[in-house]
Amino acid sequence: KAYSYVSKYDAAISNHLGILNLDNSKNKIPDTLTLHYKKAYNLRYGENPHQEGSFFVNEDMKESSIANSTQLQGKELSLNNIYDADSCLETVKEFKDNACVIVKHNNPCGVAEHQSLLQAYVDARDCDPISAFGGIVAFNNKVESDVANEIVSTFIEVLVAPSYSDEAIEILKAKPNLRVLQTPELKETTENLMDIKKVVGGILYQDADTTSDEDFVEYSVPTKRKPSEEEISTLLLAWKVCKNVKSNAIVLARDNKTVGIGAGQMNRVNSVQLAQIKSKDHYGSHDSCLASDAFFPFRDGIDEAAKAGVTAIVQPGGSIRDEEVIEAANENNMAMIFVGVRHFKH
């Protein structure tokens, strides 16, 4: 333990000095990187039962996270629970108004904003109720008894929120296996957060992706029709969700909720088609707004969106065929905005 404490201290000094240049200016990424994590607990198993697993945490993390959350009840968390709960929490952090996010296998399957947190949950769940079953649910505000009553009416694996009323906690006890996590207060961080991904023999180290609100500070409208204020609001919601969906990502939204999510397809037009398929049995895609995490390389994605009843699109822009894509949008009286920022997620 003594060596461990000393090594952590030395690592902190090394990392700090590593980002200082000769002129004392700072470079975000050091030449040598030393990471220090402490084992929180062993897991029943890893991603699959034949794999061993443990959860290691950064004790210095101040950002609200699954790592510094408190488990109020339920079975022990699995590796997949932690991974999905992290994705769910990071997505719900994107929203300032009351919001609910439901995640299944590391992809959002339903997201909604509403003045009523209960209605936000119902709207998110009903986007794709089949996928929501057995999923992870996160809220960005206090869970009261009405929400708790709705939660225990179905099966979910993990519930995440910054706080719970005493009545809600009592109601949730009706599902003793439900893992209930309370996070620290969700507030904007001033930390310089970094993102780490592992590959065999190394790690990839980068800035954490930016918040989605910043992308809408400046945007261009290349189409003949400009989006309405309502469309802009809906496009922003879709964009926030799209940033947290595995690429290629397409999100359809309407009335402050997602209506169809096309995740993880190997080409963009299939993601558009999948989002439409997902919407068919529930909310439908008519009069929806579409977000795409990267540019459309061809007009086929726009043509498919038109068939789905999409009225407005947000995308980064920047394709060599942008003019072709803009023409397709104009032919279908769609409004389209270019934000100039891509949000790939792998």
Q: What function would you assign to each model-found segment?
A:
Residues Y9-I13, I19-H346:
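ATP-dependent carboxylate/acyl-activation modules
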